[in-house]
Curated annotation (Swiss-Prot):
Motif window: Nuclear localization signal: 1-12, 444-452
Disulfide bonds: C21-C27
Name of the molecule in the record: Minor capsid protein L2
Modification note: Highly phosphorylated.
Main localization, broad class: virion
Lineage, highest ranks first: Viruses, Monodnaviria, Shotokuvirae, Cossaviricota, Papovaviricetes
Organism field: Human papillomavirus 30
Length: 463
């Protein structure tokens, strides 16, 4: 940390110190010697001047006045003489006495100059002659009308700025001879047609939109942040806080406004409830859910301190009242839709093992390589019977319905054998399996480190 030195204050001059400390007798010796010229240098000059005399050279301890005769200028420029402006004659001020006329003549009397023009000469003595006429015909001016028709138009404007109150009147129709022009100003109305209004909805369900274009979705309103560090949390147990909170702050007064608005109070010394002491404002209520219950909350402002300027300082308090708890949702045990005796292992496919016996005409035996049963499956054909053995990873017993008997065409028994076309026909396969059938390609996929031979023996499978 850098230490800052104090600013050096200027010391008073010796003259100022001598004026203040001479009378008190506390002046330092150097100040007295400097002011009274008693220093060592002053004494040497005083002693030396007693024995030396330099004449009129002006060398001494006194002021430099140049001796008795003064300094002699060595060589200077001559002074320049400035011409003075001529003096103006004084203005004579004439005094006006009480007997002098108050009218001041602007132009002095002067002689009249004759320009040479002759003066008019009047010879008559009877005055002016008046001439009268006895004609009684009025003077009529002959005005020839111009060619063309005269157009007279009238226009009506409505300005709401100069109408009190501003109203809209029916405009007057403007007429022009020969032409009809109907014009309506912007602020007016034109010829209208009365259309009776009809009621489209009489009884509603309560779900109608309140605007023409309702906003899709829901708008989440931000919840009040009542659980901050700036708010003091106070729990209220009196149920009067819900309906008449003012009775907890001051004396009951029926003039108070509705309890759903912000209530203001004057600071009082004593409150019926000590938790509401120094409360000057109680804001609007709010219902919130917290920790499994419905809570009624209000924010209050206290006026604990008051400054000289009139500003009130106090804490903000969050008053809450727990109305009722929210019951937990009952957990309903899920019941299986199928009976318990139907146990299925793994996924359902066409090779699923069904315990229920069904009347089948034949059974297909499927076994693993370690266990190869030799069950035969008699398939209904008209000419021959084929035995099929399919080794798979697990033993399943799948019922297969063979369908109707189809007589296949056969060739002659004599040699050479000539096959007839078509040799075989497509047969219907009806398998009562589960919800889906797995594509056989997925059974033939090879997996690592598991070598199981998949093969079909004894020809093809037909059903």
């Amino acid at each position: 940390m850098v230490a800052h030195r104090a600013r050096r204050r200027k010391r008073a001059s010796a003259t100022q110190l001598y004026q203040t400390c001479k009378q008190a007798g506390t002046c330092p010796s150097d100040v007295i010697n400097k002011i009274e010229h008693t220093t060592l240098a002053d004494k040497i000059l005083q002693w030396g001047s007693l024995f030396t005399f330099f004449g009129n050279l002006g060398i001494g301890t006194g002021a430099g006045s140049g001796g008795r005769a003064g300094y002699v200028p060595l060589g200077t420029r001559p002074t320049t003489v400035v011409d003075a402006s001529p003096a103006r004659p004084p203005i004579v001020v004439e005094s006006v006495g009480p007997t002098d006329p108050s009218i001041v003549t602007l132009v002095e009397e002067s002689s009249v100059v004759n320009a040479g023009a002759s003066f008019p000469n009047f010879t008559g003595t009877a005055g002016f002659e008046v001439t009268s006429s006895s004609t009684t015909t009025p003077a009529v001016l002959d005005i020839t009308p111009t060619t063309g028709s005269v157009h007279v138009s009238s226009t009506h404007f409505t300005n709401p700025s100069f109408v009190e109150p501003p109203v809209i009147e029916v405009p007057q129709t403007g007429e022009v001879s020969g032409h009809i022009l109907v014009s309506t100003p912007t602020s007016g109305v034109h010829s209208y047609e009365e259309i009776p209004m009809q009621t489209f909805a009489v009884h509603g369900t309560g779900t109608e939109p309140i605007s023409s274009t309702p906003i899709p979705g829901l708008r989440r309103i931000a919840a009040p942040r009542l659980y901050q560090r700036a708010f003091q949390q106070v729990k209220v147990t009196d149920p009067t806080f819900l309906t008449k909170p003012e009775t907890l702050i001051t004396v009951d007064n029926p003039v108070f406004e509705d309890a759903d608005t912000t209530l203001t109070f004057s600071p009082s010394g004593v409150a019926p409830d000590p938790d509401f002491l120094d409360i000057v404002a109680l804001h609007r209520p709010a219902f919130t859910t917290r920790r499994g219950g419905v809570r009624f909350s209000r924010l209050g402002t206290k006026a604990t301190m008051r400054t000289r300027s009139g500003k009130q300082i106090g804490a903000r308090v969050h008053y809450y009242y727990d109305v009722s708890p929210i019951a937990h949702t009952e957990e309903i045990e899920m019941q299986p839709l199928l009976s318990a005796n139907n146990s299925f292992d793994g996924l359902y496919d066409i090779y699923a093992n069904l315990d229920d016996e069904a009347p089948v005409s034949s059974h297909l035996s499927i076994a693993t390589p370690s266990r190869l049963p030799t069950n035969t499956v008699p398939l209904s054909f008209s000419s021959q019977t084929t035995n099929v053995t399919i080794p798979l990873g697990k033993y399943w017993d799948v019922p297969i319905y063979s369908g109707p008997d189809i007589v296949l065409p056969t060739g002659p028994t004599t040699w050479p054998y000539a096959p007839q076309a078509p040799f075989d026909t497509t047969h219907d396969v009806v398998i009562h399996g589960s919800t889906f059938a797995l594509w056989p390609v997925y059974f033939l996929r090879r997996r690592r480190r598991k070598h199981v031979p998949y093969f079909l023996a004894d020809g093809g499978v037909a059903a």
